[in-house]
Amino acid sequence: MTFINRWLFSTNHKDIGTLYLIFGTWAGMAGTALSLLIRAELGQPGTLLGDDQIYNVIVTAHAFVMIFFMVMPIMIGGFGNWLVPLMIGAPDMAFPRMNNMSFWLLPPSFLLLLASSTVEAGAGTGWTVYPPLAGNLAHAGASVDLAIFSLHLAGVSSILGAINFITTIINMKPPALSQYQTPLFVWSVLITAILLLLSLPVLAAGITMLLTDRNLNTTFFDPAGGGDPILYQHLFWFFGHPEVYILILPGFGIISHVVAYYAGKKEPFGYMGMVWAMLSIGFLGFIVWAHHMFTVGMDVDTRAYFTSATMIIAIPTGIKVFSWLATLHGGTIKWDPPMLWALGFIFLFTIGGLTGIVLANSSLDIALHDTYYVVAHFHYVLSMGAVFAILAGFTHWFPLFTGFTLHPTWTKAHFGVMFTGVNLTFFPQHFLGLAGMPRRYSDYPDAYTLWNTLSSIGSLISMTAVIMLMFIVWEAFSAKRKVLQPELTATNIEWIHGCPPPYHTFEEPAFVQVQE
């Protein structure tokens, strides 16, 4: 098989998963570089980069790169492609060529996003792309249009991927295997795919109307022609809120596997409760979107509804957190690096969830909206939730993907550095938010200097951790320590074919013996 046939025209779920992991790693480093520019600007009062336009272009690009080109490709494209077929005993994904197209839509999409920064003044709209700031007066030129096309491609990629995963998971299990016997990671990807399938078309509609408002003189979001900019916010957040659950749900699946494995348990505590909790989170995620819009002047009864509905999500989330703790209980805990990431995830994700409950209160949110309290909240659940889950999964399944083991001491040291860095970066931002420092500004009054400086020092520590990770991966491929014998394969069937598994697995249907 030629290099081009294998890597450009691939129809193999393992190879496509590897492509996604490499692309996501690369994009993650670009997104980290953007975040370091943000923290360099905010490290002390005064100006570093120029005006607020270039600052907001960097903020916007940081968000898009991290969400659409790092977290989603790694979690859904990388881990999803690699593990879902292995975990359900399928020979590949349901639509292998569409799988390849889903991946190859991402590099052009990334290219369009980068292009949007290089023409005119760039898209300094924030990742929400609200009009009228994103309209053709405040953002004349092609920047926002290129960003919109970038989102279109990334969206098509995710929709096709979602169709592929839903079909694969429902249709390609052995007949004897019921949906309630599939591993939790498979469930998490299935629910994530359903969320993508239902939410992305609404985003596509919203940004397409914005595109025609900008270029064809329609007035969907322009009051002068009977439109309403608030409509855009509803359309965007109807996608945007499910999106944040799309980013964390596969992480829930990963953490369930890692915690059970390193606690020496044959399954996570409360399997059915975990499944129903994820289903509930997926459903509730669609009916809370306007909690992002408490400041736009909705009726008090509307705000009361969105406050209560948002708080209800804490219940299934709590079920998951306590089930993970119950899985740990009585286990023989192996303090391997994946377990450290998983425990860090549980602790920090819970803190992020608690600040989320604070923000759910519509009255409190009036004061906290668009302050650094919100930034701190969602970076606790993303930078320490989603990213810690990715690193737990990566350190756990790296031997499966490559056949080589990571250096245990250096991987633990990497966890320590990263844990310190992200907490020093984002914990002080709660104080800044409570003190009223607004988001998306490149400068601030002197009173905010201390916490901003500490936050920026934290970002440099996190950067050190990223460099350590790259070195750790290089070291593993360089030293070529082989995997001797994976453990607990009876309840972790992705490992049964060896490390790494052969190019084709389950070529003949798997034999499934159902427990009585």
From Swiss-Prot:
What positions does the entry give for Na(+) binding? Answer: E41, G46, S442
| Keyword DNA repair set for record | no
Positions of Fe(II)-heme a binding: H62, H379
- Organism superkingdom: Eukaryota
Topology relative to the lipid bilayer, per the entry, is: Multi-pass membrane protein
Which biological processes are named by the entry's GO terms?
Answer: electron transport coupled proton transport; mitochondrial electron transport, cytochrome c to oxygen
> Which ranges does the record mark as transmembrane?
13-41, 52-87, 96-118, 142-171, 184-213, 229-262, 271-287, 300-328, 337-358, 372-401, 408-434, 448-479
**Record's catalysed reaction(s):** 4 Fe(II)-[cytochrome c] + O2 + 8 H(+)(in) = 4 Fe(III)-[cytochrome c] + 2 H2O + 4 H(+)(out)
* UniProt entry keywords in alphabetical sequence: Calcium, Copper, Electron transport, Heme, Iron, Magnesium, Membrane, Metal-binding, Mitochondrion, Mitochondrion inner membrane, Respiratory chain, Sodium, Translocase, Transmembrane, Transmembrane helix, Transport
Q: Please give the PROSITE patterns that the UniProt record associates with this protein.
A: COX1, COX1_CUB
Mitochondrial matrix topological segments: 1-12, 88-95, 172-183, 263-270, 329-336, 402-407, 480-516
> Which location does the Swiss-Prot or TrEMBL entry give for the cross-link 1'-histidyl-3'-tyrosine (His-Tyr)?
H241-Y245
Name its pathway: Energy metabolism; oxidative phosphorylation
Free-text cofactor note: Binds 2 heme A groups non-covalently per subunit. Binds a copper B center.
Q: Which residues lie on this side of the membrane: Mitochondrial intermembrane?
A: 42-51, 119-141, 214-228, 288-299, 359-371, 435-447
- Main site of residence? mitochondrion
**Description of how the protein assembles with itself and partners:** Component of the cytochrome c oxidase (complex IV, CIV), a multisubunit enzyme composed of 14 subunits. The complex is composed of a catalytic core of 3 subunits MT-CO1, MT-CO2 and MT-CO3, encoded in the mitochondrial DNA, and 11 supernumerary subunits COX4I, COX5A, COX5B, COX6A, COX6B, COX6C, COX7A, COX7B, COX7C, COX8 and NDUFA4, which are encoded in the nuclear genome.
Say which family it is in.
Belongs to the heme-copper respiratory oxidase family.
The name of this protein is Cytochrome c oxidase subunit 1
Tell me the organism. Coturnix japonica (Japanese quail)
